[in-house]
């Protein structure tokens, strides 16, 4: 559904017959504004400079703390990696020790070197160094 706007035909005589009124002009008051520059006192200048300096020093100090924390975090990560690597090496060596210290392996090595097992010559040594027959 379309909407059409109907315009009245332009009639120049009707347009010219309407009296044109001149707008009444009122005398305008001119306002003059002056820019007034307010001077800061010495105390205010010193106060502002001190505040800006303190803020700058605090921001530098905070950045320094952030850098130190970042470096420390990196060192911690490096140490964690080294600890993990060393613990894996330790576990590998521990399993190798268990394998090499088994009774069968020791008995086999002794046989290869010409030794024999005689129960009379065997001494059981405890972990505190005492010998038991």
Swiss-Prot record:
The lineage of its organism: Bacteria, Bacillati, Bacillota, Bacilli, Bacillales. Residues 66-133 are extracellular. It is found in: Cell membrane. InterPro entries: Cell_div_FtsL (IPR011922), FtsL/DivIC (IPR007060). Pfam families: DivIC. Disulfide bonds: none annotated. The chain crosses the membrane at residues 46-65. GO terms for biological process: FtsZ-dependent cytokinesis. It comes from Staphylococcus aureus (strain NCTC 8325 / PS 47). Essential cell division protein. Residues 1-45 are cytoplasmic. One of its GO terms (cellular component) is plasma membrane. It is a single-pass type II membrane protein. Keywords: Cell cycle, Cell division, Cell membrane, Membrane, Transmembrane, Transmembrane helix. This is Cell division protein FtsL. Belongs to the FtsL family. Its main location: membrane.
